């Protein structure tokens, strides 16, 4: 029924029963959680996984019997969030899903009796933990909006949107026992029980050495963003493109553009060997670019303030640039800035996922005494 593994090979900490929730909107949460879950299982903990939407599909391919739940989703059009359509769709589907959610929790109480909850921005497991008096640990990048201070220059022009999204983040997972916030930038922490840790990296990325190449890697998950193809074609630069044409089963070449079906291994190889990267505001891609020292032109999804904030910190650090949209001039300025970005990125260092895993091990150990 649920993903359950027995306790084997545990190190210094006692085996625990952990309820782990993953929000389904955006693949970054699922990719990060896969890495953390692998580590938890390797430490001998028993883990029940509850996830929604695409996260459930992704995790079910790696872990047995992931339990699917209803979660929030976002509707996009022309690289923008459509707020009204998103709201009504979530209300309609959420009400219909509520009885099944409650049945799942009753089953969980009877069959598993978790000792601690870990939430990657997932509300249902958080609520379960709070209503059952369990320690709740938050692991995600979204909490940087709520639990850190951001200066006025960084937020210029998005102040109102920032306040709204910060309020949403604050209301979604309040009063956790600990917040482990993944980030490649380090603004002042204002929230209690908050620790900034480096981004979670896929082991495949850590194991792939960065090499100097000449191609641009382009990763765009919104299929409504076809206008980008014309700009890239006009640049004359070799571009390896993922995401724009999801129906592909093999490479499709048009002049200097190579459209590729998504394959994780080949994507990582193209990322590690790229001269530079163009992507949306994905925190996962942004973090991997920084780790591999690849300059990034980030084009956040309209209405996603968290992506805008991350992209502005990226630009402030000199690791890349950000733009609302891409035209020939924006692309030319970015290409000209690549050497300078490479110089700034050369000083960035991260020891894999050690800092996060050490922090999580301490939190799990201390949760026993709470």
What are these regions (language model features)?
Residues 21-34:
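A short, glycine/small-residue-rich beta-strand->loop->alpha-helix junction that serves as a flexible
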Residues 155, 252, 261-262, 295-341:
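Nucleotide-sugar donor-binding patch of glycosyltransferase catalytic domains
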Residues 116-120, 269-309:
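A donor-sugar binding/catalytic signature common to diverse glycosyltransferases
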Residues 42-43, 48-96:
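Conserved nucleotide-sugar phosphate-binding/catalytic loop shared by glycosyltransferases and other
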Residues 333-370:
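C-terminal amphipathic helix plus adjacent low-complexity
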Residues 135-196:
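Active-site-proximal region of nucleotide-activated glycan assembly enzymes
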Residues 37, 200-276:
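Donor-nucleotide binding loops and adjacent catalytic segments primarily
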Residues 83-116, 123-124:
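Conserved nucleotide-sugar donor-binding subdomain of glycosyltransferases
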């Amino acid at each position: 029924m649920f993903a359950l593994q027995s306790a084997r090979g545990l190190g210094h900490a006692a085996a625990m029963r952990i309820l782990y929730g993953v929000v389904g909107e955006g693949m970054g949460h699922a990719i990060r959680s896969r890495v953390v879950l692998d580590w938890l299982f390797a430490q001998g903990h028993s883990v029940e996984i509850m996830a929604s939407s695409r996260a459930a599909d992704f995790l079910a391919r790696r872990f047995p019997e992931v339990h699917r739940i209803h979660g929030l989703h976002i509707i996009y059009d022309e690289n923008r969030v459509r707020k009204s359509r998103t709201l009504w769709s979530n209300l309609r589907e959420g009400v219909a899903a509520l009885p099944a959610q409650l049945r799942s929790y009753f089953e969980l109480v009877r069959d598993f009796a978790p000792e601690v909850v870990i939430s990657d921005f997932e509300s249902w497991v958080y609520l379960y933990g709070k209503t059952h008096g369990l320690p709740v640990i938050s692991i995600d990048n979204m909490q940087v909006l709520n639990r850190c201070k951001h200066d006025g220059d960084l937020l210029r022009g998005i102040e109102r949107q920032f306040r709204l999204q910060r309020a949403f983040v604050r209301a979604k997972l309040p009063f956790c026992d600990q917040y482990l916030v993944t980030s490649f930038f380090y603004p002042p922490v204002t929230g209690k029980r908050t620790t900034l840790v480096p981004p979670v990296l896929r082991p495949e990325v850590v194991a792939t050495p960065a090499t100097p190449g000449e191609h641009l890697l382009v990763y765009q998950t919104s299929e409504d963003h076809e206008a980008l193809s014309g700009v890239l074609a006009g640049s004359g630069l070799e571009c390896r493109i993922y995401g724009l044409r999801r129906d592909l089963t093999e490479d499709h070449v048009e002049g200097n553009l190579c459209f590729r079906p998504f394959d994780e291994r080949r994507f990582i190889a193209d990322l590690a060997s790229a001269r530079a990267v163009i992507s949306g505001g994905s925190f996962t891609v942004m973090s991997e670019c920084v780790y591999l020292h690849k300059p990034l032109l980030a084009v956040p999804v309209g209405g996603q303030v968290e992506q805008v904030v991350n992209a502005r910190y990226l630009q402030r650090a000199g690791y890349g640039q950000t733009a609302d949209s891409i035209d020939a001039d924006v692309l030319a300025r970015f290409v000209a800035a690549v050497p300078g970005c490479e110089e700034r990125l050369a000083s960035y260092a991260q020891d894999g996922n050690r800092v996060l895993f050490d922090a999580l091990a301490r939190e799990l150990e201390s949760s026993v005494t709470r």
